[in-house]
Amino acid sequence: FIIKVPLVKKKSLRKNLKEHGLLKDFLKKHSPNPASKYFPQEAAVMATQPLENYMDMEYF
């Protein structure tokens, strides 16, 4: 059987942060570290695999 999940379109995180003038600060504080993906033992912090393009998501 098929279950339909209703989706709602809203502004993306990137658009909201940009409208409030907070995008640059957010990107500085949450910059991705590609080295942690391929060399987790060499990364300074715990290795994580971030979602790519999560800031552009518009459907929830």
Curated annotation (Swiss-Prot):
Q: Which UniProt keywords apply?
A: Aspartyl protease, Digestion, Hydrolase, Protease, Secreted, Zymogen
Q: Which residues cross the membrane?
A: none
State the function annotated in the UniProt record. Shows particularly broad specificity; although bonds involving phenylalanine and leucine are preferred, many others are also cleaved to some extent.
Keyword Secreted belongs to the record? yes
Entry's Gene Ontology BP terms: digestion; proteolysis
Q: Which residues of the precursor form the propeptide?
A: 1-45
Q: Which InterPro entries does the UniProt record give?
A: Aspartic_peptidase_N
Tell me where in or outside the cell this protein is found: Secreted
As its record notes, the protein acts as a catalyst of: Preferential cleavage: hydrophobic, preferably aromatic, residues in P1 and P1' positions. Cleaves 1-Phe-|-Val-2, 4-Gln-|-His-5, 13-Glu-|-Ala-14, 14-Ala-|-Leu-15, 15-Leu-|-Tyr-16, 16-Tyr-|-Leu-17, 23-Gly-|-Phe-24, 24-Phe-|-Phe-25 and 25-Phe-|-Tyr-26 bonds in the B chain of insulin
Q: Which family does it belong to?
A: Belongs to the peptidase A1 family.
Enzyme class label: hydrolase
Which Pfam families has this protein been placed in? A1_Propeptide (PF07966)
Primary localization = secreted
Which top-level group of life is the source organism from? Answer: Eukaryota
GO CC, one annotated term = extracellular region
Descriptive protein name: Pepsin A
Q: What is its EC number?
A: 3.4.23.1
